[in-house]
Swiss-Prot record:
Keyword Cell division listed: no
Superkingdom of this protein's organism: Eukaryota
Expressing tissues: Expressed by the venom duct.
Protein name: Delta-conotoxin-like MVIA
InterPro entries (alphabetical): Conotoxin, Conotoxin_d-typ_CS, Conotoxin_omega-typ_CS
Cystine crosslinks: 54-69, 61-73, 68-77
Modified residues (Serine amide): 83
Species this chain originates from: Conus magus
TM helices/strands, residue ranges: none
Recorded family membership: Belongs to the conotoxin O1 superfamily.
Amino acid sequence: MKLTCVMIVAVLFLTTWTFVTADDSRYGLKNLFPKARHEMKNPEASKLNKRDGCYNAGTFCGIRPGLCCSEFCFLWCITFVDSG
């Protein structure tokens, strides 16, 4: 019985925490879909296609592949060249 009460309180706490820490829980989906539709009509408008601030091949990146323009990082940004 005690375990059940603890589980119920934990679930309620986590659910409340999720809504409290959300950026915009009221109009989040309402504003999300028009933006997505706009990006489908105009792929150039997508922020995912922009790689501002990425590092070129040969630049030190540590172990974070998101820093490289080519998305391949093994201490330095790597670009694979197709020979065929």
